[in-house]
Design a protein with these regions (language model features):
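Structured catalytic-domain cores with a bias toward divalent-metal coordination
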Residues: 1-237
């Protein structure tokens, strides 16, 4: 889907609309220069949709463009994606349907853990020059100068797992909070409330350590839980 939609949209926008697009990412502040995309965390929602066998596209305009230009190029990008989705609509729906069918069979499958960005490979990006416009009391604002130079950098455009863990057929919440049902419904997650005890084989994650980041990340201190899985017969609830 990446090559089918994004690459064709990129070519269409450049050739027919004069709009240049590239994989979402940020440039490193030190040499050698590296362009790195977002990681595995579901903070944008794109990764979360992927876990549900759905396709998603993250859009962000070049932040140094004037606001009207950012609106214009974002509109062109969204319309370009929609055009490609229409052209390849049947293939995309077949892909999602096949994934849903496979998931409905209840066969075990694995999810990647300890995920990290891939090693960088050489590639070229358009590096833009900016003017720094003073704003009284607020410092400076960087504004695109419409000068863009092809620059060789290291590209890190995807991430990969360090290990895999078998995904369970279901999750059990032994002591649900009052609002849990509403949250699950809002996310379209199917669930049922047990009206009688059920014996099953389960795994329980036993936390041995909680690691809280020392620096804020998007107004949150990221929390990482370390532990081990313990399995065996269980009676629910």
């Amino acid at each position: 889907a990446r090559n089918l939609i994004l690459e064709e949209t990129r070519q269409d926008l450049q050739e027919n609309h004069g709009v240049f697009t590239f994989d979402y990412g940020n440039l490193s502040q030190r040499t050698p220069l590296t362009w790195s995309t977002y990681d595995h965390r579901p903070r944008f929602g794109t990764n979360m949709l992927g876990l549900r066998n759905r396709l998603s596209v993250l859009s962000e305009a070049y932040s140094y463009l004037e606001y009207p230009k950012r609106v214009e190029v974002t509109r062109e990008f969204v319309l370009g994606i929609v055009r490609r989705a229409k052209i390849h609509g049947e293939a995309l729906m077949q892909l999602e349907a096949s994934l849903d069918e496979e998931a409905s069979k209840g066969k075990p499958f694995s999810l990647g853990l300890d995920t990290a960005l891939v090693a960088d490979t050489p590639g070229t990006i358009l590096l833009g020059a900016v003017d720094e416009v003073p704003i009284e009391g607020l410092g400076v604002r960087r504004v695109d100068r419409d000068e863009h130079v092809p620059t060789l950098v290291g590209l890190r455009l995807s991430f990969e797992p360090g290990r895999y863990s078998v995904h369970p057929r279901a999750w059990a919440i032994e002591k649900p909070e009052p609002g849990d049902q509403e949250v699950l419904k809002r996310h379209g997650i199917q669930f049922r409330i047990l009206d009688a005890p059920v014996t099953c084989t389960s795994r329980r994650f036993q936390i041995t350590e909680a690691q809280r980041a020392k620096r804020l990340f998007q107004a949150h201190y990221e929390l990482t839980l370390v532990g081990e899985w313990e399995g065996g017969p269980t009676e629910l609830p």
